[in-house]
């Protein structure tokens, strides 16, 4: 027989009345539950033993049959079957209804399924079901319409006029008849014809109707089954009744709801038998309908039925829904046996793979194992005595305990478990006390500290589970963070300080030379005798690499450090701060393997703690040195602020500009003070100032925090995020005055509230991500795709944020990579790129590499090995069965909580990058290649840009000035790689290139330049250089106003206003403080008028074709008729005042991107590339912009009024370029630029939020989530497929159907990709079990039942819910069905038969023995 657990899919359907009767073991006729005197169930009641099975094991109700030997006998007196009481959990009953009722899920949920089928509005359907109106079922030859609603009076009139010529009815019965009359095939054909006829004008309702009809047709469900003639009664042990102390009963709410239904049902039957008046019966039927509604879904009703304590009763739907529902409370999260929890304390003496387990806990957790061992060792004779011994905590027990615990791993978990490293396995070491001891290095992964955190402990029981713990989950095997592949186990805080102190070097006093020592023992002895300081530089002959001895300049501390390290760790001769320690661990891990890395970590921990203790760092007020320059700097800043205020008073600048400039001054002052303070601390005590050491080593504190202690606290922000322009000039050492203290309360409080609120947000984000990606598992070696994405280094301006080698390592190539100069093959197609190959490719000067990525993977379910590439947590190629979807979701969700919790350490100080007012390249020289755009040439030869332009340049990597007699070997335009000769010296020796570059030779100087780059030049910028100039580092290229965006005239002439009318579109306000009149454009009348400026010549003719549109809020700076020169400022728009960026901006931003929300006021993007024409006049209150492409096609774009235009007449735009300001709408990017552009945009945006917080997340994690969001397509043209216009369909199903149609010679369908938010995508997932356990449970189940959905159980979640092993790792089908076979088959068969026969005999013997014991026991009881 197949095991009940052995099934591959699960189907859900509507139950027909016959099915419900077939499930049932009898009809429940009475509302009684149990007899209050005997406390036994009432016959035919809700707990009846005849229907649901006996309450006493192997005994009937009346007691006639009492024994297992009567198993299966049905008692002739009471009718109860002799069986086990557990059947009361599975046997169902039913209630035969006196009148049909509607199922609330199918008529009440939105959209109403019944309403769609019958094409009735919900209100109309309700009025029929609740017996308020009649509905015409059959109109025959009357002038009534079928499905017409009639009130009581209208029905009477019709009856008098037509008599029995028509049929009408009310209630569920009438609806049932209508549903029975539907011919689904005909209806489907009619609706499809209507859809084709309407075409693009068809509405959503029509699409929904077709979908529901098709679902009914495909599933074999009948529409009339949505009306119930009989309702099932769930087994009594699932709605129990429990006696409390004091004789009262606690009962499940379902019993109350069932009782109401039975009451009303029997009353209705009686009334119908008595032939009561119609109105009474109708009322009773309505009440029955309400009672059944409440039973199925009490929360959907307007007035929920309340129980005794005036709380709404929990109906069947409520038992499934929400966090406390069956799905999330009992199926996805169960309480686990063999577990305990306790407070954690630090265990510095432990090895990395150990944890300290309190003896008391171990006794309880390993109880069964101890008992077994005691019996095995013959300490006791049976299990009962062993149990007693354990409970008494006898000495023998402790002797056995050590044996049991050793080499039996345990799992430790710290809530919240945000990523997979929140649960790790350790080898337990017994400790005294009641606290669990945790190794200090694993705290980072658990995010644990020892301020009272608790951890849970679990014991893996089976051999397979223990094996998994040792091989996969052991802490020593999880050194890397799955989110980015960097180490997550590394020393922090005290350990870092200890290591930094030990390896730091003190400067020698002037005139003193390093002493020379011959051997390691000599140096260490000298240091211990204080002949030389631990940090003093010395010279020593030392073995830096195996077999290589050289004289090195180092310190005794570093020698000691290297001696302590395990063999194989490279010689380390520098001061170790946190970053360098991590680098050292990473290098050892990569070069020497994980085992040496684990030994290294334990050594680092020991040495770090030891020398931190010897150092004994303390903080003193003396260590906080307030720079003497502070007073002068504040004085200077005050003067600057006063000057800005005077400019404002004179009306030269606006209020916003004044505010922005003041904030800017204080920001600069603060950052300058910080730099000086850091310098002072560094010079103090020869670099051994404790605060300075803590900060530089990375042990504790940041530059900003130290600045608040000894510099100045700086600017604070209001709760709204605006910066308060009054800075806090004091620091904590000087103390704040009352005003300053009051200002800082804002930030401090905001940090704490944010933390509390945002933690739940991050948790919810993780939950949504897991739900969408949980079924993505690596399930094949190669999907065979020919698509991929081009990767290049990520640059911000000119600084490389992520190098090419970092980005491509660990992925597979899609195309060959050829050396750009030598033409040799660096790596072939479909090859894995190792770290070494990646470096080689980068050094060869390759700019871009086309790779396979998860985004372009074509695996039908999950992803393939070659598109995924490296498993970051293990630093090797991913294995089939890895649950990469969950890892991706955790990698994005887990830092989310850190993002939220980051705010409160800073205490709300405002931080913003100081905006420069010039274009400058500080770190390198450049050669100007081109200046493009619309500009006016000024008298001094500078270019003033009247619109945005482009500045193209090449970076100078090296320059070589040739002296007399030296000859260049390259000419302008030569490509050189590392090692190519550049020029010869006088002596004929060649100088070689150190870079990959392009050479340029001018005036006897060889410049090696990088690739050409382009930056955007802002409107209003003045560029002071010309093409082909060589600009030295730090020289100004151009200047601009960072606080305002000007509108500039492009021609000489006279100003002419249009639609600029004082009082309507022009507001004139006198500033109260300064008395200066400010003229601003108001956007109140933009629907009728468009304020703009023309420039005309003396005779009044317009010069040029352009007019200058003025957006709302612009400040007007010219008068009508005023004569102006090209480049004059006509108006300017102040930039928004800057708010502090808090991660609050971060998390909601990630949420917004992942939910695919359309931004509030999105930018309008150009649909095609071409030339812009702005049309006069308005269309529907919007401005019309035409873009004409090179073939003469025009595309119309509508821009809302009041939006700031980014283009003008005659501008050339690229497809996807914004025409007005606003944020990008991802849906527009998808429609205009396609899937790859959208993926790149989302990747960039999401990673930017995390980068701002210093969190790195690998592309592939974001890629998996984005791929899941792009799984659906929308049908644009149906062709000969079964699809419906506008239907949303899974990409792979779409391709399959098209393939089928093409093979049959038909016309395939056309679809456009859809971008769904994570919540929506999770609800539209193929598995209805997973979707129902996520959100909107009833809606998902309703739809699934109608469609007769089958869940293939592919994902992890649905398998957890039904209690299967998850299809990932060793639980995958291909691993579970492995069969071992012997080459000599005949022997195997004989062996198998012998084993089976032996097992059968053993089972029979055991059963016989059990029955014999039971009978003996019963006979003994009978004798008694």
Curated annotation (Swiss-Prot):
Keyword annotations from UniProtKB, A to Z: DNA-directed RNA polymerase, Magnesium, Metal-binding, Nucleotidyltransferase, Transcription, Transferase, Zinc
Highest taxon of source: Bacteria
GO biological process: DNA-templated transcription
Cofactors, names only: Mg(2+); Zn(2+)
Catalytic activity: RNA(n) + a ribonucleoside 5'-triphosphate = RNA(n+1) + diphosphate
Binding site for Mg(2+): 449, 451, 453
Amino-acid positions noted as binding Zn(2+) 2 in the UniProt annotation, renumbered to this chain: 783, 857, 864, 867
Binding of Zn(2+) 1, residues: 60, 62, 75, 78
GO molecular function annotations of the record: DNA binding; DNA-directed RNA polymerase activity; magnesium ion binding; zinc ion binding
Transmembrane segment boundaries: none
GO cellular component terms listed in the entry, alphabetical order: DNA-directed RNA polymerase complex
NCBIfam families reported for this sequence: rpoC_TIGR
Family annotation (PANTHER family): DNA-DIRECTED RNA POLYMERASE (PTHR19376), DNA-DIRECTED RNA POLYMERASE SUBUNIT BETA (PTHR19376:SF54)
Function as written in the Swiss-Prot or TrEMBL entry: DNA-dependent RNA polymerase catalyzes the transcription of DNA into RNA using the four ribonucleoside triphosphates as substrates.
Subunit architecture: The RNAP catalytic core consists of 2 alpha, 1 beta, 1 beta' and 1 omega subunit. When a sigma factor is associated with the core the holoenzyme is formed, which can initiate transcription.
Protein name: DNA-directed RNA polymerase subunit beta'
Organism: Treponema denticola (strain ATCC 35405 / DSM 14222 / CIP 103919 / JCM 8153 / KCTC 15104)
Gene name tied to this protein: rpoC
């Amino acid at each position: 027989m197949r095991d009940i657990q052995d099934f591959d899919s699960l189907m859900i359907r509507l139950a027909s009345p016959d099915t419900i009767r077939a499930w049932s073991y009898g009809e429940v006729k009475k509302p009684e539950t149990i007899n209050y005197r005997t406390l036994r169930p009432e016959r035919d009641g809700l707990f009846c033993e005849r229907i649901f099975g006996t309450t006493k094991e192997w005994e009937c109700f009346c007691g006639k049959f009492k024994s297992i030997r009567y198993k299966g006998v049905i008692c002739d007196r009471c009718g109860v079957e002799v069986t086990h009481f557990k059947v009361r959990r599975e046997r169902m009953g039913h209630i035969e209804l006196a009148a049909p009722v509607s199922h609330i899920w199918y008529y009440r949920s939105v959209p109403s399924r019944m309403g769609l089928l019958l094409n009735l509005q919900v209100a109309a359907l309700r009025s029929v079901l609740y017996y308020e109106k009649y509905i015409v079922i059959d109109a025959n030859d009357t002038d009534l319409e079928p499905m017409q609603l009639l009130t009581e009076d209208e029905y009477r009139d019709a009856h008098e006029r037509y008599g029995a010529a028509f049929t009408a009815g009310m209630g569920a019965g009438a609806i049932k008849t209508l549903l029975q009359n539907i011919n689904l095939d005909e209806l489907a054909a009619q609706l499809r014809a209507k859809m084709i006829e309407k075409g693009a004008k068809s509405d959503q309702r029509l699409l929904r109707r077709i979908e529901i009809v098709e679902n009914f047709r495909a599933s074999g469900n009948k529409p009339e089954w949505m009306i119930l003639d009989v309702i099932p009664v769930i087994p009594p042990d699932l709605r129990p009744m429990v006696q409390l102390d004091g004789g009262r009963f606690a009962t499940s709410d379902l019993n109350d709801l069932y009782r109401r239904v039975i009451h009303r049902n029997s009353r209705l039957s009686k009334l119908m038998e008595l032939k009561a008046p119609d109105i009474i019966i109708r009322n009773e039927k309505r009440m029955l309908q309400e009672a059944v509604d409440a039973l199925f879904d009490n929360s959907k009703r307007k007035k929920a039925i309340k129980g005794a304590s005036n709380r709404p009763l929990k109906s069947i739907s409520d038992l499934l829904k929400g966090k406390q529902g069956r799905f999330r409370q009992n199926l996805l999260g169960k309480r686990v046996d063999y577990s305990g929890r306790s407070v954690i304390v630090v265990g510095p003496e432990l090895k990395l793979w150990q944890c300290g387990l309190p003896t008391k806990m171990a006794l309880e957790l390993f109880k069964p194992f101890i008992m077994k061992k005691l019996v095995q060792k013959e300490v006791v004779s049976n299990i009962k005595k062993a149990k007693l011994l354990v409970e008494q905590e006898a000495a023998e027990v402790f002797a056995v305990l050590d044996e049991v615990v050793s080499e039996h791993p345990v799992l430790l978990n710290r809530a919240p478990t945000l990523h997979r490293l929140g649960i790790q396995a350790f080898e337990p070491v017994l400790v005294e006390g009641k606290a669990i001891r945790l190794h200090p290095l694993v705290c980072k992964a658990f995010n644990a500290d020892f301020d009272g955190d608790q951890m849970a402990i679990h014991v893996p029981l089976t051999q397979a589970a223990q094996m998994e713990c040792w091989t996969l989950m052991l802490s020593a095997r999880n050194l890397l963070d799955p989110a980015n592949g960097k180490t997550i186990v590394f020393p922090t805080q005290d350990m870092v300080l200890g290591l930094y102190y030990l390896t730091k070097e003190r400067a020698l006093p002037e005139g003193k030379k390093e002493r020379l020592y011959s051997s390691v023992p000599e140096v260490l002895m000298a240091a211990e005798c204080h002949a030389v300081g631990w940090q003093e530089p010395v010279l020593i002959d030392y073995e830096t690499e195996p077999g290589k001895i050289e004289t090195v300049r180092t310190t005794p501390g570093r020698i000691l450090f290297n001696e302590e390290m395990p063999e194989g760790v490279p010689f380390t001769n520098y001061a170790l701060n946190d970053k360098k320690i991590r680098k050292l661990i990473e290098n050892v891990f990569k070069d020497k393997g994980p085992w040496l890395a684990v030994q290294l970590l334990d050594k680092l921990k020991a040495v770090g703690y030891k020398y931190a203790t010897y150092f004994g760092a303390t903080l003193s007020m003396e260590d906080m040195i307030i720079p003497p320059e502070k007073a002068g700097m504040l004085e200077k800043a005050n003067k600057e602020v006063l000057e800005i205020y005077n400019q404002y008073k004179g009306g030269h600048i606006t209020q916003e500009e004044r505010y922005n400039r003041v904030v800017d001054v204080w920001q600069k002052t603060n950052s300058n003070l910080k730099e000086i303070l850091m310098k002072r601390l560094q010079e103090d005590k020869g670099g051994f100032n404790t605060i300075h050491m803590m900060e530089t080593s990375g042990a504790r504190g940041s530059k900003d925090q130290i600045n608040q202690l000894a510099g100045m606290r700086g600017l604070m922000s209001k709760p709204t995020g605006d910066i308060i322009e009054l800075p806090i000039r004091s620091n904590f050492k000087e103390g704040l005055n009352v005003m300053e203290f009051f200002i800082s309360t804002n930030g401090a409080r905001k940090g704490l509230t944010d933390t509390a609120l945002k933690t739940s947000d991050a948790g919810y984000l993780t939950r949504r991500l897991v739900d969408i990606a949980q079924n993505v598992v690596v399930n094949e070696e190669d999907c065979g795709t020919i698509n991929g994405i081009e990767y290049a280094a990520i640059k911000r301006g000119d600084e490389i944020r992520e190098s090419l080698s970092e980005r491509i390592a660990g992925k597979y190539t899609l195309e060959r990579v050829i050396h750009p100069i030598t033409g040799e093959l660096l790596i072939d197609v479909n090859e894995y790129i190792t770290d070494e190959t990646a470096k080689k490719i980068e050094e060869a000067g390759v700019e871009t590499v086309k790779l396979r990525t998860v985004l372009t993977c074509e695996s039908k379910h999950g992803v393939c090995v070659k598109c995924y590439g490296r498993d970051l947590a293990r630093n090797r190629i991913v294995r089939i069965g890895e649950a990469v979807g969950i890892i991706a979701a955790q990698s994005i969700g887990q830092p989310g909580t850190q993002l939220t919790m980051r705010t409160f350490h800073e205490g709300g100080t405002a931080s913003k990058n100081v905006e420069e007012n010039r274009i400058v390249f500080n770190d390198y020289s450049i050669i100007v290649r081109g200046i493009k755009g619309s500009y006016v040439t000024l008298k001094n030869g500078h270019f003033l840009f009247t619109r945005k332009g482009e500045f193209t340049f090449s970076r100078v990597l090296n320059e070589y000035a040739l002296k007399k007699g030296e000859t260049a070997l390259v000419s302008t335009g030569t490509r050189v790689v590392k090692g190519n000769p550049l020029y010869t010296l006088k002596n004929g020796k060649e100088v070689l290139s150190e870079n990959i570059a392009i050479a340029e030779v001018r005036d006897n100087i060889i410049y090696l330049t990088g690739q050409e780059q382009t930056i955007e030049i802002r409107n209003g910028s003045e560029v002071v250089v010309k093409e082909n100039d060589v600009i030295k580092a730090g020289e100004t290229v151009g200047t601009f106003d960072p606080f305002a965006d000007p509108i500039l005239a492009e021609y000489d002439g006279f100003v002419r206003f249009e639609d600029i009318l004082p009082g309507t579109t022009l507001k004139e306000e006198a500033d109260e403080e300064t008395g200066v009149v400010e003229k601003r454009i108001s956007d109140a009348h933009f629907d009728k008028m468009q304020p703009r400026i023309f420039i005309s010549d003396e005779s009044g003719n317009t010069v040029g074709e352009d007019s200058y549109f003025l957006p709302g809020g612009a400040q007007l700076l010219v008068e009508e008729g005023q004569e102006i020169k090209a480049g004059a400022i006509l108006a300017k728009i102040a930039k928004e005042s800057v708010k502090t960026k808090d991660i609050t901006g971060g998390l909601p931003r990630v949420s917004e991107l992942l939910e695919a929300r359309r931004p509030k006021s999105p930018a309008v993007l150009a649909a095609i590339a071409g030339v812009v024409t702005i049309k006069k006049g308005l269309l529907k209150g919007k401005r019309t912009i035409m873009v004409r492409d090179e073939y003469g096609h025009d595309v119309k774009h509508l821009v809302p009024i009041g939006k700031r235009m980014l283009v003008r007449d005659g501008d050339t735009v690229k497809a996807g370029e914004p025409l007005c300001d606003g944020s990008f709408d991802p849906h527009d990017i998808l429609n205009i630029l396609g899937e790859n552009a959208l993926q790149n945009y989302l990747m960039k945006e999401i990673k930017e939020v995390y980068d701002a917080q210093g969190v790195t997340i690998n592309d592939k994690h974001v890629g998996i989530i984005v791929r899941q969001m792009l799984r659906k397509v929308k049908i644009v043209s149906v062709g000969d497929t079964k699809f419906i216009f506008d239907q949303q369909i899974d990409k792979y199903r779409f391709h399959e159907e098209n393939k089928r149609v093409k093979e049959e010679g038909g016309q395939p369908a056309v679809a456009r990709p859809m971008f769904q938010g994570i919540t929506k995508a999770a609800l539209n997932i193929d598995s209805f079990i997973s979707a129902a356990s996520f959100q909107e449970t009833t809606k998902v189940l309703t739809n699934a039942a109608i469609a007769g959905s089958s869940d293939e159980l592919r994902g992890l979640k649905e398998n957890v819910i039904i209690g299967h092993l998850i299809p990932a790792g060793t639980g995958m089908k291909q691993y579970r069905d492995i069969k071992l076979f012997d080459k000599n088959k005949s022997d195997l068969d004989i062996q198998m038969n012998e084993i089976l026969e032996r097992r059968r005999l053993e089972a029979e013997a055991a059963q016989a023995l059990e029955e014999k014991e039971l009978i003996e026991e019963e006979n003994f009881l009978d004798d008694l």
